[in-house]
Amino acid sequence: MNRKLVTVLSVLVIIVFIGYIIIDTAKPLESSKDDAKKSETNEVPDAWKISTEFKAGGDSLKAVTVTLSGKIYVGGNAFVSCYDKGLGLLWTVKTPSAVTGLSNYGDSVFASTRAQILVMNPDGKILNEWGPFEDKSLITSVSANRRFVAFADAENKTVYILDKGGEVKKIIGQNDKHFIIPSPYFELVLDNMNNLYVANTGMHRIETYSIDGVLKSFFGEPGLAPENFCGCCAPAHFAIIPQGFVTAEKGINRIKILNKKGEFVEFVNSKNSFIKSVPLDLASADGVTIYAAYPGDSKLYVFTRK
């Protein structure tokens, strides 16, 4: 009986020892995989360059949008400014509070503040003020198409869809608490086909919704590799371009292009001295020129291909 017990114990010791060897061997492999991913990120060159940078508008630059005709609107701490395609200043207007996001469609410019949506004409006249929509809110993004205006509220983790009269047509995320928003970055884009793209930053992905709030698809995973989204919450900002998407991250402050399936195409800018925790807001009307508003120095950066 004692011999059997000794035999069993001996076998168990051998199994434990073999298991330790396997685990100990696997750790360096996992570490090498992580190192390989970091190395892969460092080895991919930027395909674009900064062609222009200049101090735009006033203090605390936060947002940018560009029209098909080339007009550039920027916004920040209680202002919206408009520039022509040659970056000549056309006008600057004061806003009731700091601007957090910008969009344009047709003859209208839409500026989000913490609690409201400002409707402006191309000359900067404020025609309407929509909201507040909640007792406490933090609107971080606004986007418009022919029929609708959508905005994202990072405080309440909800997306509002309005008609062009400012009436609420749909609220997404109010009941199911679907959006995970760890920080005040919550971006959305509404396209001309009424597809609504939303950055669910805590999930590290871009989700596509119908105008009725039905989730249709999504892409994105956390990680350091070029095709992944890094940091606690990403993408912080993004815009739709003919090629697909141009996205901005924080943690590793990098701008990249993904195709329409969400697959990595190229880096716009990944080797820079931008503050890691301060991402750049993005806009592009044609996918040829990309505009980026950087709150770190209140400059507008213009990217073109190398």
Regions found by a protein language model. Give the residues of each.
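Eukaryotic scaffold repeat domains enriched in small/polar residues
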Residues: 2-306
